Amino acid sequence: MIIRSPEPEVKIVVDRDPVKTSFEEWARPGHFSRTLAKGPDTTTWIWNLHADAHDFDSHTGDLEEISRKVFSAHFGQLSIIFLWLSGMYFHGARFSNYEAWLSDPTHIGPSAQVVWPIVGQEILNGDVGGGFRGIQITSGFFQLWRASGITSELQLYCTAIGALVFAALMLFAGWFHYHKAAPKLAWFQDVESMLNHHLAGLLGLGSLSWAGHQIHVSLPINQFLDAGVDPKEIPLPHEFILNRDLLAQLYPSFAEGATPFFTLNWSKYAEFLTFRGGLDPVTGGLWLTDIAHHHLAIAILFLIAGHMYRTNWGIGHGLKDILEAHKGPFTGQGHKGLYEILTTSWHAQLSLNLAMLGSTTIVVAHHMYSMPPYPYLATDYGTQLSLFTHHMWIGGFLIVGAAAHAAIFMVRDYDPTTRYNDLLDRVLRHRDAIISHLNWVCIFLGFHSFGLYIHNDTMSALGRPQDMFSDTAIQLQPIFAQWVQNIHATAPGVTAPGATTSTSLTWGGGELVAVGGKVALLPIPLGTADFLVHHIHAFTIHVTVLILLKGVLFARSSRLIPDKANLGFRFPCDGPGRGGTCQVSAWDHVFLGLFWMYNAISVVIFHFSWKMQSDVWGTISDQGVVTHITGGNFAQSSITINGWLRDFLWAQASQVIQSYGSSLSAYGLFFLGAHFVWAFSLMFLFSGRGYWQELIESIVWAHNKLKVAPATQPRALSIIQGRAVGVTHYLLGGIATTWAFFLARIIAVG
């Protein structure tokens, strides 16, 4: 038994009125920095103002003050999120065809934006069905609202107003907890209390309340909707909540109330807490009763998890003990010291959170189509494509952010003198081995994955299809992926005897699900084409990781620049007289990593878009014959680079290129404009700073001649500013181009 000294009691301590509220301060740009507060001498001032406004580390070195600023900023962020949500719900209430869509979701498209007739813009209001003209939306809000049990635009109005109230509340909380009652540092560092509250409160009670809402409101309302009852005839949510007999008509066990729960006769609740698997054939979404069951189960798990950590009662886990006990035979001191790192460096903490949240977001992208959670989501191809693309991009950005903050931690917060032989130290000591091996893997993957395509292009050009890698010639079947698919397809009755169907139709085995003559989902076959593009995914992901990881591991020092830590997180070069030392800062690795993240995600969303159009999405005739959008051409066309260019990019761009004069013409303009934004980025990425400074000086000379020179001297962008502007426009242009290409295509053919 471990004897430990009694822990200090956890008390919530705040400082009263620590910082006075001052509008004068607010109105003075750069008030947080002595240099910036003086005002501009040159145009560089405005860049530094933007770079440092939210870099709280540069305002003060006091961890408590930094923590309070971050905490307060989080409330501001939540306020903006509530405002945005309120806007979404308001559009649904004021400008949408939600009620019409609800009555006939298979023939009417979702729209929540009607363009005013100014200079002919009303051409954008396409016919979405049911006599409504507007812009077709692909956000999935209609499907989400239906799943929540929202049946009228009035309910959307009320929710929008509620969200505004919460936005105001959050704004107030941000001010209050910085200016009136600011928590002490000890409060921010009390990880056990934080874990208990977040796990039991946010996740546990949050899931429980959602499960309760689903059982008492969503399930009965969706039951009526699925049966074709007019939304106006359906009882209102509060009637279901207050009147148990109403629910008992749909689910008889409701008449017994909580008795089965306390008598452990839980199977009585199996009417509305199911374990079916698969999709509801009426809506093409997961069974809402499965989803309610899932949230109830998750709630129980998190409520238990929220009681595991030791606070004032002397029982439970201590995070520090867990981390320090975490060592194996080959890991030296293991995680000793990690507790101190994560409670004093918010960059280290944020880095872990971003990495996990980014990975989770990408997992969400893959589940939204394979297990579509909301009714009529699976047959809304535009929304399916948008949700996948959106979650992939977001996940990519979050993971790059994880590397960025890990590197900032290394430069600003890592103290090498106190770390010896723990896991982080051991990783840093053999970083050369890690990076050189990773580099070898990248070279191997790059040559081999691309080489397979080049081989196919060459054989195709020489007219030798029998010598190509394809399903009909030299097969490279993804046998491991097919094995995983098969395990999951055969799980019901074998490894998961309680389930009636497998978790997802995509595994195989089952029949397809079609709603209103459109395919919702079917078993997805994998072949040589998928094997090839999968290895391109492996290649681009490994290169992204190589760049980002090198940036983190060499953030403080390298053979080239041993004192890199003294130069900071971002610097252009190691000073004059040190040639070949540009683009070595940790910031530059993030900059370069962003381009490879963009490459990686682009290939993923292209693969998804084409694969789904070729092998999944389409129509089904009365005889049961499925006609896919691109007729199953993925397997034979995507095995050459030429096929990707000709049969995917070029063939599917026809809708966006020919969109002029139609309701999709805005996408044509965006396609053009975003290409322009992307090209504009190259001007910054390939620029020579001196060239612009010379040009500026001759323009300033002309202004002086005419006596119209400004007091603030113009300066060319610094090297890092130029790169920042360049990568921003590169990503913005590239993503918006892809967005216009995808949506014009899928709205036209889907």
Curated annotation (Swiss-Prot):
List positions binding chlorophyll a.
683, 691
Report membrane topology.
Answer: Multi-pass membrane protein
Instruction: List positions binding phylloquinone.
Output: 692
Give UniProt keywords alphabetically.
4Fe-4S, Chlorophyll, Chloroplast, Chromophore, Electron transport, Iron, Iron-sulfur, Magnesium, Membrane, Metal-binding, Oxidoreductase, Photosynthesis, Photosystem I, Plastid, Thylakoid, Transmembrane, Transmembrane helix, Transport
Is the keyword Transport assigned to this protein? yes
SUPFAM superfamilies listed in its UniProt record = Photosystem I subunits PsaA/PsaB
Subunit record text: The PsaA/B heterodimer binds the P700 chlorophyll special pair and subsequent electron acceptors. PSI consists of a core antenna complex that captures photons, and an electron transfer chain that converts photonic excitation into a charge separation. The eukaryotic PSI reaction center is composed of at least 11 subunits.
- Family listed: Belongs to the PsaA/PsaB family.
Q: What is this protein called?
A: Photosystem I P700 chlorophyll a apoprotein A1
